[in-house]
């Protein structure tokens, strides 16, 4: 699986549609390839123009194939495209590479957008779960719950083929590319490559092809067991056996500390995990609550028996103070308190936060506020990233997003989910979607092909070919 550069998928749309009052105007065509020196010049120009901050940790790109509704290879990219809008909202890494602070995935219910995020979650959990196998910590158990890696079910061939993952990420030390191929929990292929940021030197660290394992470069002197389980990732084994190795630690710290997923489906547990004793987290939460113009001025947490907690909010209305139990608050406020600690921690630490159906948790006005907070480099000083799925179209506009921050997922008539970015769309004249276009309006009109009632006007036979 190769995903070194930004990928562009080609989708063919039927222009003259029967029983439809409008025509599809856009299709996805390959962009012009940006040469390395051209891209570097663009990145340096942006950095000089806006003086963007430098960060060290980043999710760069994720690719998956044959996972649940995803049959064919799809790539989700957090690398900024060379486009002109909102150039002050880009995260700049130490070697002038530019990354996105926010990405939203849109699409109909059942279209597969959650599966894109679940695929990433499944990969991270597959690596980390063995490291915490003996832990009795309830929070860790909740985070490390087993996620079943299932192949695409609507094709006889793919049902018997492995699922393929590829993850491209950065730490303060290096850029890593990790590949994992899994079939019925068994590891068929695994590889880890590294580029040291200080020298730019690229090297392979290990390669595993079924039972054959080769350790290279910084791992050349490490040893593996002849009885290594075929369901245990080699990366996990190295983390257990060589936890003090600098490179092993650097890689696994990213998996463990630099990316979080929020979709546990258990509100009480979620709240207990969210509420933090950190004064920095509380201070930032209160700042955000005030900026949202809510009348909560403070809150406190009481720990109860059986690992229960109660949260009390302090309100001031017309100079009158009152304290309420969080469970007496509106559902929106309760959802906000389950969410804001994760947001605050991500902003303070500069981590990647992945949330399924973020819009279901909060009001559209607050959703816009959170998106703009991550996009504001004065507030997002550590280079945190927010990735989420959404149905909310009120934020799908050029004020809130760059075109490369908007993604769509849609299913074809073979139930195969396709993932594509708004920046990839081109019309027949080779023109991109305008940066000042009304994205939400064009989406509803079917010009981006990710709405269920538009399936009949998309030539999915050609797409799925």
Predicted regions and their residues:
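Electropositive, glycine-dotted interaction segments
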Residues: 175-301
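Conserved amphipathic alpha-helical "coupling/scaffold" segments
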Residues: 158-175
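Conserved ABC ATPase signature
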Residues: 102-106, 308-344, 348, 352-365
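Extended helical coiled-coil dimerization/tether regions that scaffold
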Residues: 55-57, 65, 263-328, 448, ...
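C-terminal lobe/lid and adjacent interdomain/linker elements of RecA-like ASCE P-loop ATPase modules
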Residues: 50-61, 372-465
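Pre-Walker A-like glycine/lysine-rich segment at the N-terminus of P-loop NTPase domains
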Residues: 47-125
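Short, positively charged and aromatic/hydrophobic N-terminal segments
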Residues: 11-32, 39-54
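Phosphate-binding glycine-rich loops of NTP-binding sites
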Residues: 98-147, 336-337, 342, 373
């Amino acid at each position: 699986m190769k995903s070194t550069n930004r990928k562009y998928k080609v989708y063919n749309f039927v222009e003259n549609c029967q029983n439809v009052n409008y025509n599809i105007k856009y299709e996805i065509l390959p962009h012009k390839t940006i040469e390395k020196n051209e891209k570097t010049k663009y990145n340096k120009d942006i950095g000089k123009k806006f003086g963007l901050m430098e960060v060290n940790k980043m999710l760069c790109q994720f690719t998956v194939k044959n996972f649940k509704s995803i049959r064919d290879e799809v790539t989700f990219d957090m690398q900024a495209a060379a486009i002109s809008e909102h150039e002050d909202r880009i995260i700049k890494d130490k070697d002038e590479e530019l990354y996105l602070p926010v990405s939203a995935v849109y699409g109909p219910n059942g279209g597969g957008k959650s599966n894109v995020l679940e695929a990433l979650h499944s990969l991270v959990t597959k690596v980390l779960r063995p490291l915490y196998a003996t832990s009795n910590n309830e929070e860790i158990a909740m985070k490390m719950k087993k996620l079943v890696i299932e192949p695409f079910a609507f094709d006889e061939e793919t049902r018997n083929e492995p699922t393929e993952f590829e993850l491209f990420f950065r730490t303060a030390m290096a850029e890593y590319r990790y590949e994992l191929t899994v079939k019925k929990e068994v590891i068929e292929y695994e590889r880890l490559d590294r580029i040291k940021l200080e020298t730019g030197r690229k090297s392979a660290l290990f390669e595993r092809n079924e039972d054959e394992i080769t350790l290279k470069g910084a791992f050349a002197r490490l040893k593996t067991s002849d009885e290594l389980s075929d369901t245990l990732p080699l990366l996990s084994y190295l983390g257990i056996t060589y936890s003090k190795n600098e490179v092993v630690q650097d890689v696994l710290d990213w998996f463990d500390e630099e990316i979080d997923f929020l979709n546990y489906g258990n509100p009480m547990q979620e709240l207990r995990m969210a509420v933090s004793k950190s004064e920095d987290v509380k201070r930032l939460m209160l700042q955000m609550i005030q900026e949202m113009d809510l009348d909560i001025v403070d809150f406190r947490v009481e720990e109860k028996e059986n690992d229960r907690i109660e949260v009390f909010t302090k309100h001031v209305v017309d100079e009158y103070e009152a304290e309420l139990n969080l469970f007496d608050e509106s559902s929106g406020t309760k959802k906000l308190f389950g969410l804001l600690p994760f947001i605050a921690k991500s902003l303070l630490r500069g981590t990647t936060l992945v949330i399924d159906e973020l819009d279901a948790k909060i009001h559209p006005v607050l959703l816009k506020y959170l998106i703009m907070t991550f996009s504001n480099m004065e507030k997002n000083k550590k280079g945190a990233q927010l990735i989420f799925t959404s149905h909310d179209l009120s934020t799908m506009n050029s004020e809130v997003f760059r075109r490369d921050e908007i993604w769509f997922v849609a299913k074809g008539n073979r139930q195969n989910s396709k993932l594509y970015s708004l920046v990839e769309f081109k019309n027949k004249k080779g023109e991109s979607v305008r940066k000042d276009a009304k994205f939400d309006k064009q989406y509803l009109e079917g010009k981006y092909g990710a709405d269920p009632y538009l399936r009949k006007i998309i030539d999915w036979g050609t797409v799925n070919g």
